[in-house]
Amino acid sequence: RSSASPHLFIKAVELIEQEGFISKAPVAERPSILAARELRSAFFTRAEDVSDWDVQREIAGLLHVDFDNILNKLKTGEAIARLTKDYDLAQLHGIEGSPTYVINEGRQKLFGNVSYGVIAANVNEMLASQGVDAASLC
């Protein structure tokens, strides 16, 4: 099994969002964000095979996204093209896994099981030093 199928599903939902077929919503409420959350929940809490199109179809239904539109993005190659761009960006920025946070224009990278405190310290340091040409203390 592969995680590529659920990633393609998310990319298809993103494309549909951008084309206006899904109403605009705040970031946390966008169908693509909710789809990613539902896929994680299905995988980690219910031990479902999220590469299975039936599972993805069910999630699309929960989110009121037409699964035929998703399939169209897969058939036309648009979803794989978008996912490939993400993979190319990951290589460019040296992303080796998830989660990875790239900050300070790529000069800092937080990878793996990083505590909220470490993330907050880095973000707060960046906000405090905006416009200052100095090295981060984090």
State where each predicted segment sits:
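C-terminal cap of thioredoxin/glutaredoxin-like
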Residues: 23, 27, 34-138
